[in-house]
């Protein structure tokens, strides 16, 4: 393999390898960056594996230029001098001791590259590349599995997943995002250990799900999560949402079909589709249903913005139905919302999955194209002070009057402040 990436990130990582090699240490690119280059993809970041100890790495590169993020595990971070260079993780070749928390080893022993490869998760991630000699070092059969498009655990899959439970989700993500196959023994090990996924921190689980749901292969990911038992282990709320196991399965697969048609690369839009079964059919009470969704998202420790966007999309999931017949004061605020483009994508995915008419979505897209943000959400013509100044005491009537004037403005019945004040006076006099 010839190094084809000439980005600042690659050049920076290469400079670290050159420094280490010049000092007499072994240094290689490792893991995902090797996999990506063999696949013809540009790596997002670079990891370097070396025979140098963390102290030797910091002494060589400069302690003021390094961050010992996991020195006890042989890991040092080297930030670039410019944002375009990113940061390179430099790890000493190591063999891990016993895993006691399902995530990190209790101890490490520095070793050779061949031994280091055995501790890694999957064969496609277990290769090294010598950028100075343009040579791939493959001790685990990763190149063959890349060619055969297989995700296979290194060594005993049961042991690999026992060491680090997050690998259960990573197996699904790599399989689906690369459009590979999950090797049978590896899949059996995932199924057997699926309920252990909750030993991993919620934040890490959510991050893996976020990455899967934002990817175009999200439907494939959800099907494999269901097939391996991980979906219900992480989201037990989705069990029996349609009354019976058969109905629930059919409804979930219908959601997966919608996800297959979702064009937006948005995890929030995907979540809105995936969680809709929580509102059907027993969840007739919209408020209580959204409370259930909100509680689930908070349990997953999503950000307030993510929760707000997902719950808005679910609450407005049918808002585009019959949109051409709605008044402008309904259409404009809906389409002015920051998530309206995602609502359109969700609606279009729903129609596409059902082979139904998407005239409402087309109308919305045309309306958005024909109206600027200022036209969709113009500044109000009057304020609450104008209402109070006309003798209306503070209370709910002020809001009612303001909404009435605002609706008239959005319906283009009034266009100036003078007209708004005149209409306000008329409504007060009624």
Spans of features found by a protein language model:
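Catalytic cores of the polymerase beta-like nucleotidyltransferase superfamily
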Residues: 1-430
């Amino acid at each position: 393999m010839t190094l084809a990436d000439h980005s600042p990130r690659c050049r920076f990582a290469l400079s670290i390898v050159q420094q280490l090699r010049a000092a007499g240490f072994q240094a290689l690119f490792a893991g995902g960056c090797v996999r990506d280059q063999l696949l013809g993809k540009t790596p997002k970041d670079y990891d370097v594996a070396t025979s140098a100890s963390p102290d030797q790495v910091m002494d060589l590169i400069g302690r003021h230029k390094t961050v010992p993020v996991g020195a006890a595990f042989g890991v040092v971070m080297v930030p670039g001098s410019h944002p375009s260079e990113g940061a390179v993780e430099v790890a000493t070749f190591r063999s891990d001791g016993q895993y006691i928390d399902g995530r990190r080893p209790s101890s490490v022993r520095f070793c050779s590259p061949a031994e280091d490869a055995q501790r890694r998760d999957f064969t496609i991630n277990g290769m090294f590349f010598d950028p100075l000699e343009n040579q791939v070092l493959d001790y685990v059969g990763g190149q063959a599995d890349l060619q055969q498009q297989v995700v296979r655990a290194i060594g005993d899959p049961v042991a690999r997943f026992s060491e680090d439970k997050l690998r259960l989700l990573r197996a699904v993500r790599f399989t689906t995002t690369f459009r590979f196959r999950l090797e049978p023994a590896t899949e059996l090990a995932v199924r057997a250990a699926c309920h252990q996924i909750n030993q991993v921190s919620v934040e890490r689980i959510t991050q893996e799900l976020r990455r899967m749901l934002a990817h175009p292969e999200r439907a494939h990911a959800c099907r494999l999560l269901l097939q391996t038992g991980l979906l219900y282990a992480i989201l037990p709320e989705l069990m029996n949402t349609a009354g019976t196991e058969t109905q629930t399965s059919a409804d979930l697969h219908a959601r997966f079909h919608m996800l297959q048609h979702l064009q937006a690369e948005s995890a929030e839009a995907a979540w809105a589709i995936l969680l809709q079964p929580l509102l059907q059919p027993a969840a007739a009470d919209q408020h209580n249903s959204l409370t259930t969704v909100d509680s689930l998202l908070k349990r997953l420790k999503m950000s307030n913005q993510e929760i707000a966007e997902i719950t808005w999309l679910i609450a407005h999931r049918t808002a585009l139905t019959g949109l051409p017949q709605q008044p402008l004061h309904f259409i404009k605020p809906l389409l002015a919302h920051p998530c309206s483009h995602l609502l359109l994508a969700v609606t279009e995915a729903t129609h596409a999955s059902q082979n139904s008419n998407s005239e409402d979505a087309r109308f919305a897209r045309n309306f958005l194209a024909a109206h600027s943000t200022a036209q969709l959400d113009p500044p109000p013509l009057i304020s609450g002070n104008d209402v109070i100044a006309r003798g209306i005491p503070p209370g709910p009537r002020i809001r009612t009057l303001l909404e009435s004037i605002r609706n008239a403005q959005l319906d283009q019945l009034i266009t100036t402040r003078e007209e708004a004040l005149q209409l306000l006076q008329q409504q007060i006099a009624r």
